[in-house]
């Protein structure tokens, strides 16, 4: 291994056919009057890897379009995967987690690595050569360690520069937006500025005291030190006591960092853009007079920057645009943003005969409500539920427990279930999402409720908030079914590549510490009287945190207040696309009120358009599940179009579309087989929609076409 230095690039060569790892640092002082490119002070060591676009690449990690649609890559030594192997596994899983990877669903025709930037289907595997730069953003303590990543394709043109943000969706790691804004940016020759926003795969195995490093390898917390992605804030004495009381548990960064990182998602997104500018100017800036430094050549005045991503990453993009005091962001194009709006009683949103006043509900409000009601509501329409894995007996017990708590009414289970569903609809869920309540409870809602409660309240893992903890659990046929057990060493070793950042993930589950007889897997735990009811006490405890007066509740409420956004995009052009049937981030709680609040605060200066898509929901990857594909279309198709339209506007002045409802056509079935998707199923966004499809704002009222 040799080290040389040139133009602030310290090059560490590795004997590998496909990559050279670089360590990038600011150096040189420059001369008076020169605008020297300087590394932001919050950035740590920058590690860079070159990819040839054949054996390995930026978009597919060498897998190509075919490999992303095939079986998952594995490490040669599952217990000791290399950083390169972990990266490949991460890109494979994160790409597929956001998209439907079925040919019939549009992969390879509407989207995918082989579909070029103009939408033309090619025979290419879609591999993209370029260089990738990774670093932590931190305040010097090692407690933040927000992972930042910049990808610069070889097609980047410094004469026509562009940057796209790729803040991770959900609680995902730094590659979380690879298939959404990452793919769009790389195909269009833009640098992509990613960040895990302080969530990601920071998993601290408290029993064995091991943690993730920046590139995914695992080490002891002691050996990792400040290089750890996340180490729980426990003294050795506290950790020993915790392990004695609750063995085999895990602390996870999003839940247990005690920083309420969501309040800073906009900040981290802006820092990712600044990181991208630093990298680009190190590569393309002219040499300074000292012969070592580089001058700032690319800057907001000559570079297009689109803040983008989906879900939580989309909310981060909007937050970044609100916070942008340096003019870093030129425009915004996002999909299904998880965005929470400051209260404003002036606003109301109308769709048909339904009117909701105010600016919607907070994430924890609708997550904790769904966590209570969804299992019972799943029984309201059992024949039409999509991919329903809710246990009927346990759900019936949940209905009875809700009735005993005075939260629903009815004389039969059917009536109780109908009332639970009615209360979800009255809260603001769209009727189109009713068939999804069951599957969302099974796959998403409890995870969101538990993790975000911990995050908002800045709770430590040792607090065991509402009796919840995270652990691997025994298989049904094992000696200790559903009880906490030691986790799989192989699953932990590859957690950087396979984890979504929010338990249940990589075999780490949500555990009810208060289960009768001892801790058990939450869904299988026993309530008072040894009743299986999906842990009603835990669900009620979480709900109390929203509006209660306990010390824990006040902490959570403070944290929620810290993440509310104003709707002020400072007049930046912006596009939001959102599926009407979204049951994870319902439109009535997010995009609709955000659109209205933006119109109130910006008035005539607002350049935000809102696109609501019928027959689209939150998780395109779920389109592969039974019942989803025939009912719903890929929202990703409209994300791509929104990005195309925003780029055209910023580059050529092309008109942005007016706010509208796009009316799609479900694929349906032929016999038991879902029909292949065609362009007729997903008509394009119109620049000027028909009157019957318009979304309008007047007199503080958002009116959404029914």
From Swiss-Prot:
Keyword Transcription recorded: no
Q: So where does this one cross the membrane?
A: none
InterPro entries, per the entry: OHBut_olig_hydro_put
Query: Main EC class of this protein?
Result: hydrolase
Taking the first listed entry, what is the main subcellular location of this protein, grouped into a coarse class? Answer: secreted
| Keyword set, alphabetical order | Hydrolase, Secreted, Signal
Residues at the active site: 311
Which Gene Ontology biological process is one annotated for this entry?
butyrate metabolic process
Q: Which reaction does it catalyse?
A: (3R)-hydroxybutanoate dimer + H2O = 2 (R)-3-hydroxybutanoate + H(+)
Pathways involved? Lipid metabolism; butanoate metabolism
The EC number of this protein is 3.1.1.22
* Annotated Gene Ontology cellular component terms: extracellular space
Cite a single Pfam family from the UniProt record: 3HBOH
Where is this protein found? Secreted
Positions the record marks as coiled coil are none
Q: Which cysteines are disulphide-bonded?
A: none
First and last residue of the signal peptide? 1-32
Q: Its biological function?
A: Participates in the degradation of poly-3-hydroxybutyrate (PHB). It works downstream of poly(3-hydroxybutyrate) depolymerase, hydrolyzing D(-)-3-hydroxybutyrate oligomers of various length (3HB-oligomers) into 3HB-monomers.
Similarity field? Belongs to the D-(-)-3-hydroxybutyrate oligomer hydrolase family.
What is the name of the protein in this document? D-(-)-3-hydroxybutyrate oligomer hydrolase
Protein source organism: Polaromonas sp. (strain JS666 / ATCC BAA-500)
């Amino acid at each position: 291994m040799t080290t040389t230095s040139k133009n602030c690039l310290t090059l560490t060569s590795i004997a590998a056919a496909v990559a050279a790892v670089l360590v990038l640092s600011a150096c040189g002082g420059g001369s008076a009057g020169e605008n020297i490119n300087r590394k932001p002070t919050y950035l740590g060591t920058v590690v860079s890897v070159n990819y040839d676009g054949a054996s390995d690449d930026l978009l597919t990690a060498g897998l190509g379009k075919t490999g992303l649609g095939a079986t998952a890559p594995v490490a040669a030594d599952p217990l000791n995967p290399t950083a390169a192997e972990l990266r490949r596994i991460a890109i494979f899983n994160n790409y597929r987690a956001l998209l439907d990877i079925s040919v019939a669903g549009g992969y390879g025709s509407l989207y995918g690595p082989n579909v070029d930037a103009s939408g033309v289907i090619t025979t290419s595997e879609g591999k993209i050569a370029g260089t990738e730069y990774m670093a932590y953003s931190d305040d010097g303590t090692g407690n933040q360690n927000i992972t930042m990543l910049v990808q610069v394709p070889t097609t980047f043109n410094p004469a026509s520069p562009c940057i796209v943000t790729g803040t991770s969706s959900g609680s995902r790691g730094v590659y979380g937006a690879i298939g959404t804004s990452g793919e769009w940016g790389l195909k269009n020759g833009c640098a992509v500025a990613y960040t895990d926003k302080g969530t990601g795969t920071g998993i601290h195995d408290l029993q064995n005291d091991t943690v993730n490093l920046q590139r995914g390898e695992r080490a002891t917390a002691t050996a990792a030190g400040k290089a750890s992605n996340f180490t729980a804030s426990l003294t050795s004495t506290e950790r020993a006591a915790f392990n004695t009381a609750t063995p085999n548990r895990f602390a996870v960064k999003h839940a247990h960092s005690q920083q309420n990182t969501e309040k800073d998602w906009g900040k981290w997104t802006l820092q990712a853009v600044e990181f991208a500018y630093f990298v680009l100017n190190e590569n393309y800036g002219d040499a300074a007079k000292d012969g070592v430094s580089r001058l700032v050549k690319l800057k907001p005045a000559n570079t297009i920057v689109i803040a983008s991503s989906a879900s939580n990453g989309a909310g981060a993009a909007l937050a970044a645009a609100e916070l942008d005091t340096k003019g870093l962001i030129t425009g915004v194009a996002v999909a299904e943003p998880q965005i929470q709006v400051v209260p404003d009683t002036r606003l109301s949103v109308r769709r048909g005969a339904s009117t909701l006043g105010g600016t919607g509900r907070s994430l924890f409000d609708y997550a904790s409500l769904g966590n209570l009601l969804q299992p019972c509501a799943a029984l309201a329409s059992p024949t039409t539920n999509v991919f329903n894995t809710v246990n009927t007996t346990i759900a019936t017990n949940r209905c009875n427990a809700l009735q005993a708590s005075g939260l629903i009414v009815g004389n039969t289970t059917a009536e109780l279930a109908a009332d639970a569903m009615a209360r979800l609809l009255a809260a603001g869920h769209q009727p189109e999402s009713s068939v999804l309540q069951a599957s969302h409870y099974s796959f998403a809602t409890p995870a969101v409720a538990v993790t975000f409660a911990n995050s908002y309240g800045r709770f430590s893992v040792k607090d065991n908030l509402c009796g919840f903890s995270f652990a691997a659990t025994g298989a049904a046929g094992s000696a200790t079914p559903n009880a906490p057990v030691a986790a799989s060493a192989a699953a932990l070793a590859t957690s950087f590549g396979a984890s979504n950042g929010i338990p249940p993930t990589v075999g780490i589950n949500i555990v009810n510490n208060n289960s009768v007889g001892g801790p058990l897997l939450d869904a299988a735990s026993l309530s008072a009287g040894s009743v299986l009811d999906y842990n009603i006490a835990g669900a009620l405890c979480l709900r109390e945190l929203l509006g209660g007066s306990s010390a824990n509740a006040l902490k959570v409420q403070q944290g929620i207040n810290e993440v509310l956004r104003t709707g002020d995009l400072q007049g930046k052009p912006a596009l939001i696309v959102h599926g009407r049937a979204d049951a994870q981030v319902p439109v009535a709680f997010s995009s609709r009120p955000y659109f209205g609040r933006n119109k109130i605060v910006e008035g005539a200066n607002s350049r935000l358009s809102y696109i609501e898509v019928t027959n689209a929901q939150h998780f395109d990857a779920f389109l592969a599940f039974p019942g989803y594909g025939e009912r719903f279309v890929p929202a990703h198709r409209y994300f791509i179009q929104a990005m195309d339209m925003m780029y055209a506007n910023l580059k050529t002045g092309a008109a942005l579309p007016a706010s509208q409802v796009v009316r799609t056509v479900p694929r349906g079935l032929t016999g038991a087989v879902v029909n292949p998707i065609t362009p007729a199923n997903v008509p394009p966004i119109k620049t000027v929609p028909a009157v019957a499809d318009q979304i309008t704002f007047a007199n503080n009222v958002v009116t959404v076409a029914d």
